[in-house]
Amino acid sequence: MMRRWRQWKHTRLMPEKKQGDMDGVKSVLSQLIRNNIFADEDQIVLVKGCYIINLGKFDKDGIMAKAIVYFVTSKLNNIYEELPPQATNAERVELRHFTVIDEAHYMLGFKNKPLQNLIAVGRNKGKSVILATQNMDSFKSKHFDFYANAQYPLIMKQQQQNDGVLKDLFGVSGIALQELKQAIAGLQKGELITKDNKAIALGLGKHWKKIKVTRF
């Protein structure tokens, strides 16, 4: 019912002479209706449980997968816009929710306004958005400067490295950049490289540090 109502509402907002035409939004809504992927009534409370949305049966770069992520991030935006800022003190900040988007490069190549808002609004609302991708070039999107909003970049071993992204993320150049690239190429299983914010603030040592993670 809600899906059809959204399509009807969008049609009503169009000029009268064009209400019978099929545009991009109506095309997506029509596919959502035909695939019957949403329940008639939304009863899921996204911030009070752990949910995995499996998009495996949809084309990763297709309109359906993008639409599902679009609607979920829109719902999260609506929730967090109503919340007060996160609680903080001298040592800690409140974390309310994590959203992890795997293979995020599929969601960075178009104007994904809900995702952009989620990152921008969520930063002081206790909302953490983790964008996982093997292609760091994707963060230099023409639609939104995602990596400029990356407070805690975590770099795993990868062969394809983008000098521009690494420079912007870690504030390095010249010899320091080459050392960082060598460190990334030499990472082992379970090892990550992240910013060393204390070293950056003090202007001492390297701008990055290596950490090792373990399975719990």
Located regions from the model:
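Hydrophobic/aromatic beta-strand patches that form the interior of the parallel beta-sheet core
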Residues: 51-53, 130, 152-154
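Conserved H-loop
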Residues: 124-127, 132-138, 157
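ASCE P-loop NTPase helicase motor core
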Residues: 139-144, 170
